[in-house]
Protein backbone atom coordinates (compact mmCIF):
# COMPACT_ATOMS: atom_id res chain seq x y z
CA UNK A 1 0.00 0.00 0.00
CA UNK A 2 1.18 3.53 -0.71
CA UNK A 3 -0.21 6.89 0.36
CA UNK A 4 -0.33 9.18 -2.67
CA UNK A 5 0.50 12.55 -1.09
CA UNK A 6 3.38 11.60 1.19
CA UNK A 7 4.58 8.42 -0.50
CA UNK A 8 4.36 6.57 2.83
CA UNK A 9 4.39 2.79 2.33
CA UNK A 10 3.21 -0.42 3.97
CA UNK A 11 4.22 -3.87 2.75
CA UNK A 12 3.36 -7.31 4.16
CA UNK A 13 3.92 -10.86 2.89
CA UNK A 14 1.36 -13.66 2.71
CA UNK A 15 1.46 -17.27 1.56
CA UNK A 16 -1.38 -16.85 -0.93
CA UNK A 17 -3.23 -14.13 -2.83
CA UNK A 18 -6.66 -14.98 -1.44
CA UNK A 19 -9.47 -12.89 -0.01
CA UNK A 20 -8.48 -13.18 3.65
CA UNK A 21 -4.85 -12.24 2.90
CA UNK A 22 -5.96 -9.29 0.78
CA UNK A 23 -8.32 -7.97 3.46
CA UNK A 24 -5.84 -8.57 6.28
CA UNK A 25 -3.18 -6.64 4.38
CA UNK A 26 -5.50 -3.65 4.06
CA UNK A 27 -6.44 -3.75 7.75
CA UNK A 28 -2.81 -3.92 8.85
CA UNK A 29 -1.89 -1.16 6.41
CA UNK A 30 -4.56 1.21 7.73
CA UNK A 31 -3.43 0.48 11.29
CA UNK A 32 0.17 1.21 10.30
CA UNK A 33 -0.82 4.50 8.65
CA UNK A 34 -2.91 5.41 11.69
CA UNK A 35 -6.11 6.25 9.85
CA UNK A 36 -8.20 5.78 6.73
CA UNK A 37 -8.01 7.92 3.57
CA UNK A 38 -11.19 9.15 1.89
CA UNK A 39 -10.67 6.71 -0.97
CA UNK A 40 -8.40 3.79 -1.82
CA UNK A 41 -7.42 2.86 -5.38
CA UNK A 42 -7.23 -0.87 -6.07
CA UNK A 43 -6.24 -3.22 -8.78
CA UNK A 44 -9.20 -4.98 -10.40
CA UNK A 45 -8.33 -8.09 -8.37
CA UNK A 46 -10.62 -11.12 -8.32
CA UNK A 47 -10.37 -11.30 -4.53
CA UNK A 48 -12.20 -7.95 -4.31
CA UNK A 49 -14.34 -7.84 -7.46
CA UNK A 50 -17.19 -10.23 -8.30
CA UNK A 51 -17.73 -8.90 -11.81
CA UNK A 52 -17.11 -5.89 -14.00
CA UNK A 53 -14.12 -3.59 -13.90
CA UNK A 54 -13.16 0.03 -13.29
CA UNK A 55 -16.19 2.21 -12.47
CA UNK A 56 -18.48 -0.75 -13.17
CA UNK A 57 -16.80 -3.14 -10.72
CA UNK A 58 -19.05 -4.96 -8.26
CA UNK A 59 -17.20 -5.77 -5.05
CA UNK A 60 -17.42 -8.98 -3.03
CA UNK A 61 -19.58 -8.92 0.09
CA UNK A 62 -16.58 -9.16 2.44
CA UNK A 63 -14.78 -6.32 0.71
CA UNK A 64 -17.93 -4.20 0.78
CA UNK A 65 -18.13 -4.83 4.54
CA UNK A 66 -14.48 -3.77 4.91
CA UNK A 67 -14.98 -0.47 3.07
CA UNK A 68 -18.12 0.25 5.11
CA UNK A 69 -16.32 -0.54 8.38
CA UNK A 70 -13.49 1.90 7.64
CA UNK A 71 -15.69 4.40 5.72
CA UNK A 72 -13.52 4.70 2.61
CA UNK A 73 -14.62 4.81 -1.02
CA UNK A 74 -13.09 2.03 -3.15
CA UNK A 75 -11.90 2.93 -6.65
CA UNK A 76 -10.90 0.16 -9.05
CA UNK A 77 -8.44 0.34 -11.92
CA UNK A 78 -9.18 -0.93 -15.40
CA UNK A 79 -7.60 -4.23 -16.50
CA UNK A 80 -4.02 -4.08 -17.85
CA UNK A 81 -3.70 -0.38 -16.99
CA UNK A 82 -0.63 -0.34 -14.76
CA UNK A 83 -0.25 3.44 -15.09
CA UNK A 84 -3.45 3.89 -13.07
CA UNK A 85 -1.65 2.52 -10.01
CA UNK A 86 1.93 3.42 -10.88
CA UNK A 87 2.94 4.26 -7.29
CA UNK A 88 2.17 0.71 -6.16
CA UNK A 89 3.70 -0.90 -9.26
CA UNK A 90 6.97 0.92 -8.51
CA UNK A 91 6.77 -0.07 -4.84
CA UNK A 92 7.42 -3.75 -5.58
CA UNK A 93 10.78 -2.97 -7.17
CA UNK A 94 11.63 -0.40 -4.49
CA UNK A 95 11.21 -2.90 -1.67
CA UNK A 96 12.99 -5.69 -3.54
CA UNK A 97 16.05 -3.53 -4.26
CA UNK A 98 16.34 -1.95 -0.83
CA UNK A 99 15.03 -4.48 1.69
CA UNK A 100 16.35 -7.65 0.05
CA UNK A 101 19.77 -6.65 -1.28
CA UNK A 102 21.83 -8.33 -0.02
CA UNK A 103 19.50 -11.27 0.50
CA UNK A 104 18.64 -11.49 4.23
CA UNK A 105 18.71 -14.76 6.16
CA UNK A 106 15.04 -15.36 6.98
CA UNK A 107 13.48 -18.67 8.06
CA UNK A 108 9.83 -17.78 8.83
CA UNK A 109 7.17 -15.53 7.36
CA UNK A 110 7.01 -13.72 10.71
CA UNK A 111 10.69 -12.79 10.33
CA UNK A 112 10.01 -11.69 6.76
CA UNK A 113 7.17 -9.40 7.82
CA UNK A 114 9.27 -7.99 10.66
CA UNK A 115 11.96 -7.16 8.09
CA UNK A 116 9.40 -5.51 5.81
CA UNK A 117 7.92 -3.48 8.66
CA UNK A 118 11.39 -2.33 9.67
CA UNK A 119 12.03 -1.12 6.13
CA UNK A 120 8.68 0.70 5.99
CA UNK A 121 9.56 2.54 9.22
CA UNK A 122 13.03 3.45 7.94
CA UNK A 123 11.55 4.72 4.67
CA UNK A 124 9.69 7.43 6.57
CA UNK A 125 13.00 9.24 7.10
CA UNK A 126 13.54 9.33 3.32
CA UNK A 127 13.03 12.59 1.42
CA UNK A 128 11.58 12.39 -2.10
CA UNK A 129 13.36 14.49 -4.70
CA UNK A 130 11.76 17.93 -4.98
CA UNK A 131 10.07 17.74 -1.57
CA UNK A 132 11.10 19.83 1.44
CA UNK A 133 9.87 17.40 4.09
CA UNK A 134 10.53 13.74 4.80
CA UNK A 135 7.92 11.12 3.98
CA UNK A 136 7.13 10.73 7.67
CA UNK A 137 6.59 14.47 8.11
CA UNK A 138 4.29 14.67 5.09
CA UNK A 139 2.39 11.61 6.31
CA UNK A 140 1.70 13.35 9.62
CA UNK A 141 0.54 16.51 7.85
CA UNK A 142 -2.07 14.74 5.75
CA UNK A 143 -3.61 12.80 8.67
CA UNK A 144 -5.91 15.70 9.53
CA UNK A 145 -7.79 14.86 6.32
CA UNK A 146 -8.04 11.16 7.16
CA UNK A 147 -10.85 9.27 8.86
CA UNK A 148 -9.98 8.02 12.37
CA UNK A 149 -9.80 4.25 12.79
CA UNK A 150 -12.97 2.71 14.27
CA UNK A 151 -12.79 1.42 17.86
CA UNK A 152 -13.12 -2.19 16.73
CA UNK A 153 -10.85 -3.97 14.28
CA UNK A 154 -12.44 -5.52 11.19
CA UNK A 155 -12.10 -9.31 11.19
CA UNK A 156 -10.76 -10.29 7.75
CA UNK A 157 -10.53 -14.02 8.47
CA UNK A 158 -12.40 -16.85 6.78
CA UNK A 159 -14.49 -18.07 9.73
CA UNK A 160 -16.44 -21.33 9.92
CA UNK A 161 -18.27 -23.37 12.56
CA UNK A 162 -17.40 -27.06 12.44
CA UNK A 163 -17.55 -30.16 14.63
CA UNK A 164 -14.32 -31.89 15.63
CA UNK A 165 -14.11 -35.62 14.90
CA UNK A 166 -13.52 -38.49 17.34
CA UNK A 167 -9.75 -38.03 16.99
CA UNK A 168 -9.84 -34.37 18.08
CA UNK A 169 -9.20 -33.18 14.54
CA UNK A 170 -10.91 -30.37 12.68
CA UNK A 171 -10.91 -29.94 8.91
CA UNK A 172 -10.25 -26.54 7.41
CA UNK A 173 -9.33 -25.69 3.83
CA UNK A 174 -8.39 -29.25 2.71
CA UNK A 175 -6.30 -30.04 5.81
CA UNK A 176 -6.82 -31.27 9.38
CA UNK A 177 -5.60 -29.69 12.61
CA UNK A 178 -5.68 -31.14 16.12
CA UNK A 179 -7.27 -29.60 19.21
CA UNK A 180 -7.00 -30.68 22.88
CA UNK A 181 -8.75 -34.04 23.30
CA UNK A 182 -11.29 -32.52 25.70
CA UNK A 183 -12.90 -30.83 22.69
CA UNK A 184 -13.45 -34.03 20.73
CA UNK A 185 -16.85 -34.13 18.97
CA UNK A 186 -17.66 -30.53 19.93
CA UNK A 187 -18.68 -27.58 17.78
CA UNK A 188 -15.81 -25.13 17.51
CA UNK A 189 -14.91 -22.02 15.52
CA UNK A 190 -12.06 -21.97 13.00
CA UNK A 191 -10.67 -18.63 11.84
CA UNK A 192 -8.34 -18.80 8.86
CA UNK A 193 -6.29 -15.67 8.27
CA UNK A 194 -3.72 -15.23 5.52
CA UNK A 195 -0.92 -17.01 7.36
CA UNK A 196 -2.53 -18.52 10.47
CA UNK A 197 -5.30 -20.88 11.55
CA UNK A 198 -6.84 -20.08 14.94
CA UNK A 199 -9.25 -22.53 16.58
CA UNK A 200 -11.64 -21.34 19.30
CA UNK A 201 -14.23 -22.78 21.67
CA UNK A 202 -16.74 -20.38 23.22
CA UNK A 203 -14.52 -17.46 22.23
CA UNK A 204 -11.36 -18.93 23.81
CA UNK A 205 -8.37 -19.85 21.62
CA UNK A 206 -7.58 -23.56 22.08
CA UNK A 207 -5.10 -24.07 19.22
CA UNK A 208 -3.16 -22.07 16.63
CA UNK A 209 -1.16 -23.17 13.59
CA UNK A 210 0.68 -21.79 10.61
CA UNK A 211 -1.78 -22.12 7.76
CA UNK A 212 -1.00 -24.96 5.37
CA UNK A 213 -2.07 -24.42 1.76
CA UNK A 214 -1.20 -27.93 0.66
CA UNK A 215 -3.78 -30.71 0.41
CA UNK A 216 -4.71 -33.62 2.71
CA UNK A 217 -2.21 -32.84 5.46
CA UNK A 218 -2.82 -33.55 9.14
CA UNK A 219 -1.18 -31.36 11.77
CA UNK A 220 -0.90 -32.77 15.27
CA UNK A 221 0.18 -31.04 18.46
CA UNK A 222 1.35 -33.75 20.90
CA UNK A 223 0.35 -31.66 23.92
CA UNK A 224 -3.27 -32.00 22.83
CA UNK A 225 -3.19 -35.74 23.53
CA UNK A 226 -1.00 -36.04 26.66
CA UNK A 227 -3.93 -36.41 29.07
CA UNK A 228 -5.51 -39.08 26.87
CA UNK A 229 -2.23 -41.00 26.51
CA UNK A 230 -1.79 -40.98 30.29
CA UNK A 231 -5.15 -42.73 30.59
CA UNK A 232 -4.22 -45.24 27.87
CA UNK A 233 -0.44 -45.73 28.20
CA UNK A 234 -0.23 -48.62 25.71
CA UNK A 235 -1.47 -46.30 22.95
CA UNK A 236 1.96 -44.69 22.98
CA UNK A 237 3.21 -47.36 20.57
CA UNK A 238 0.67 -46.75 17.83
CA UNK A 239 -0.92 -43.34 18.41
CA UNK A 240 -0.81 -41.20 15.26
CA UNK A 241 0.01 -37.97 17.16
CA UNK A 242 3.16 -39.61 18.53
CA UNK A 243 4.18 -41.14 15.21
CA UNK A 244 3.78 -37.79 13.49
CA UNK A 245 5.46 -35.56 16.09
CA UNK A 246 8.10 -37.64 17.89
CA UNK A 247 11.38 -38.51 16.07
CA UNK A 248 11.69 -42.23 15.30
CA UNK A 249 15.07 -42.30 17.09
CA UNK A 250 13.23 -41.87 20.37
Can you name each region flagged by the protein language model?
Residues 35-55:
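Acidic/histidine-rich, metal-coordinating catalytic segments
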Residues 1-7, 14, 66:
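Short conserved beta-strand segments at catalytic cores or DNA/RNA-binding microdomains
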Residues 42, 54, 74-96, 112:
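RNase H-like two-metal-ion nuclease catalytic core shared by retroviral integrases
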Residues 197-250:
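Protein C-terminal end segments and domain termini
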Residues 92-191:
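Active-site-proximal acidic segments at structured loop/helix or strand boundaries
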Residues 11-34, 213-220:
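Active-site beta-loop-alpha junctions of metal-dependent nucleic acid enzymes
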Residues 64, 68-85, 104-106:
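RNase H-like polynucleotidyl transferase catalytic core
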Amino acid sequence: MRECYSGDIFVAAFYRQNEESFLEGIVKGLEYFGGTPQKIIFDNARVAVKEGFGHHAKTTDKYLALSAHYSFRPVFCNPAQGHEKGLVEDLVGLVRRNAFVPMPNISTIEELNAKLLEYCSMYRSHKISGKNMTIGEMAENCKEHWIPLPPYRFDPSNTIQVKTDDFSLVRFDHNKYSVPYQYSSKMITVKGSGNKVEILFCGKTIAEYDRDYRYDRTHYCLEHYIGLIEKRPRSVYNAAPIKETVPTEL
